[in-house]
Every structure is written in C-alpha cells, then in structure tokens.
A protein has these predicted regions:
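N-terminal beta1-alpha1 ligand-phosphate binding loop
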Residues: 3-26
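Catalytic-core regions of hydrolytic enzymes
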Residues: 37
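Short amphipathic alpha-helix with an adjacent loop that forms part of the alpha/beta core around
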Residues: 40-46
C-alpha cells in the first residue's frame, strides 16, 4: 500500500467531490475518492501520501479537513480546494496561506491548488436577513457577487487541478 494514494474529499455543494474526481484521473495508483467523514486513524496509518480536497470556510479549510489534517503526522499531502470568490483576491491569498500552514505543520506539503467553487445561494441568501452589524450578515451587494460563483469549478479549473496534482505527485 506504500505507493497507493487515497483521495479524500469534503463537500457540501459537490465542489470538493468534483475536484477529487479530477485528481483521481491524475493519480495512477489511487483509491477513492472517499468522503472525509469515513476516514479513520487506521486508514491514516496505512498510507504515506494523500490527496485531500476541501472547501473554504471562514478564511481556511472546512472543519472536517482541519480535523483530518491535524490527525496526520509525517505524511505527504496534496491539498486541493474550492473558494466561493475569485482566486485572485486578498481573501484567496489568506486562505492559501492558512491552508498551507495547516498542511505543513506536521506533514510535508507536496502542493496546494485552489480554484473557484459554486456557493449554495439558498444557504447564503438566508444571511441577508441577519441585521447589518450582526455576525453572519451578508449584504445584498455581496450576495449578488456570490452569483458569479455558479458553474465553478468549470472544465478549465478541473483540467488545471489534474495538471497540478500530477505535478505535485511527481515530487513524492
């Protein structure tokens, strides 16, 4: 199993799964993709290299991904994720820095890839009803910007994910 690479995803909208499937096409000797919630310490102990697909939440990886990575030590990680806004923003740079730090703390990060992902607009629209100034409030202006996330990750972003994972894997 030393050469086998598990592909693990965390998702609410399906973005993480789409990235994981794309990654699988670039990893010849893989197992998965597997839902992150089924990954036990026994699974972690069996493998050396992992591809982990996450979604962004509050400027970093989602809670399930943070939990999984914090349980890993001495592993080689390829971390790929989706973000609801454009990846050429200050927020995206912050997400990258936070996820890279998380993945590098106790493991070797072979590479990180981030692309845009669709936002569940039904979920976020409810936040427009939270009064301005209160935690979680979403302005209508920001909600309108979130609509630009629909259709992501697109074919070009999935192709880029495949290429990135193949490149990162060559470092293992």
């Amino acid at each position: 199993l030393a050469d086998t690479v598990p592909i693990i995803f965390s998702t609410i909208t399906g973005n993480g799964y789409k990235l994981a499937v794309a990654a699988a096409e670039a990893v010849p000797n893989h197992v998965g993709p597997y839902n992150i919630r089924y990954i036990t310490d026994e699974v972690i102990d069996k493998f050396d290299t992992f591809v982990i697909s996450y979604w962004c939440n509050h400027g970093t990886a989602d809670d399930d991904t943070i939990d999984l990575i914090s349980r890993m030590h001495g592993k080689k990680l390829i971390v790929i994720g989706t973000l609801g806004v454009s990846v050429d923003t200050a927020h995206a740079a912050k997400v990258c820095a936070n996820v890279i730090a998380l993945a590098s703390e106790h493991n070797t990060l072979l590479g990180h890839y981030l692309c845009r992902g669709s936002i569940d607009l039904k979920r976020t629209f409810a936040r427009t009803r939270i009064p301005e100034g209160q935690k979680g409030h979403l302005s209508m202006e920001r909600f309108e910007k979130q609509k630009q996330s629909l259709g992501h990750p697109n074919a070009e972003e999935l192709d880029a994910a495949r290429a990135a994972v193949a490149e990162f894997l060559s470092k293992a």
